Amino acid sequence: MQIIDDKVLLVRTPDPKPIISQIKKSALLETHNGVSKVAIHWGMKEARMLAAMNAPNVPSPILRDYAWTGRLTPFEHQKSTASFLTLHDKAFCFNEQGTGKTASVIWAADYLMKRGEVSRVLILCPLSIMDSAWRQDLFKFAMHRSCSVAHGTAKQRAKIIKAGSEFVAINFDGLAVVEEEIVNGGFDLIVVD
């Protein structure tokens, strides 16, 4: 898949019909030796549709539109991970330990928040990394976002969740004691770490 002028995705495929019939902003350019070239508008909707068709290596518009926030410049594999995460409603990230998965997730969530697709993120993780990994990394990579760690008594956790931080980290054991608050908390993105 090739990006042309930051506007168009050029796809080479043996069967252009599924793309042309499902993606309105697409056009068949040519067919030669059984391979068709299809031009597709490079928007989030179109990229998600291509990803849903299992097209390989679909780039998300995050690569073009996002100003990578924070104190560190992302590596290409972090950009690729964030791109992948923005294209799928549900996704697993099995990158190796120490490759910057947390930063990639933060950037993907921040981008979706800037697009108005996500308003609050619930992070389920072990107690040992709620602060050291999530709160600290949120400050490092998206210091403009609010983050709270929901820990303590049930009353304290409920108060923290109701306070409205954009990112809330809670440990797995803490879920049961504030289930109602979480269900009613307006979380539209959930990260399980």
Segments (PLM) and residue ranges:
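N-terminal accessory interaction module
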Residues: 1-52
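SF2 helicase/translocase NTPase motor core
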Residues: 16-24, 30-31, 45, 55-83, ...
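The Walker A (P-loop) glycine that initiates the GxxxxGKT/S ATP-binding motif of P-loop NTPases
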Residues: 95
